[in-house]
């Protein structure tokens, strides 16, 4: 949703032509390569006003929803991303973030409970932004702005029927946070007579780990499950862990989505293009309802190799609908 007009439209057309019909859309809160913008209005003094919107941000989001709907492309939104709220990487995203009390006119550090610097990896869970809900620390100051953002997002997205909702990107935060926002989104949707599909994406690479039980064990809150982190593995281990998740869910079956397949030459994870190709097919043949290559350099994106895999998968599915068969081992 952060790109200017022509670049994403060309990519969506390329995706649809290859037989693809699913994209990932994090509601990015970081400046990337000069084209990304924030959802809030910026004042002449350089500070943000969290009570005023940046219209361009929301116009881009609306365009994404409109153009993907025209092409029958499913949009999986990620509402929050912990990496946007940290200074751990060289980009130091938190230093420029509108929620940083140094960067807005709406609250101070003492009023919000937010520091102006968070140098640790977000996996250490030292960012109070993700502890605001009533069954956590109930930070009313921050929660009001978070709710306002989600309400604005839903104002746009609930007008469409091709949107899935994921609370976070690869989090290891508290279950109470995910449960609150899943319930919040569902209630807002029902107020508009809409039904929504919601999940959470946990960071644990082990699908049999306790984190994933937080979604697996709560079908009343989570309509599908996210298994992207399984693709950090490869070969038999990747296959076996996906099979274990599928078996665990068999009592109350729900779709398993893989919105990020890792693996590309030059990846920070030391992976290869071949690993990405194999990972895509393992997830697809193992029962994933949706499979998408992660962006470069962590994945193959929508390059020629990815397009070839999409076309092959579509041809296979035309001959043997994959939902009509089961893995044999």
Please describe what each predicted stretch is.
Residues 1-222, 234:
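Active-site mouth of glycoside hydrolases
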Residues 256, 263-266, 272-329:
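Aromatic- and carboxylate-lined catalytic core of secreted/periplasmic carbohydrate-active enzymes
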Residues 20, 73, 254, 288-289:
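Short glycine/serine/threonine/alanine-rich loop segments
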Residues 58-61, 150, 178, 182, ...:
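Amphipathic alpha-helical segments in well-structured domains
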Residues 67, 248, 282-283:
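Hydrophobic/aromatic ligand-binding patch that stacks against planar heteroaromatic rings
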Residues 71, 192, 251-252, 286:
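Helix C-cap/helix->beta junction micro-motif
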Residues 171-172, 202-205, 209, 221-278, ...:
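Active-site clefts of carbohydrate-active enzymes
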Residues 158, 170, 230, 288, ...:
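Residue-level marker of positions within ordered structural domains that often coincide
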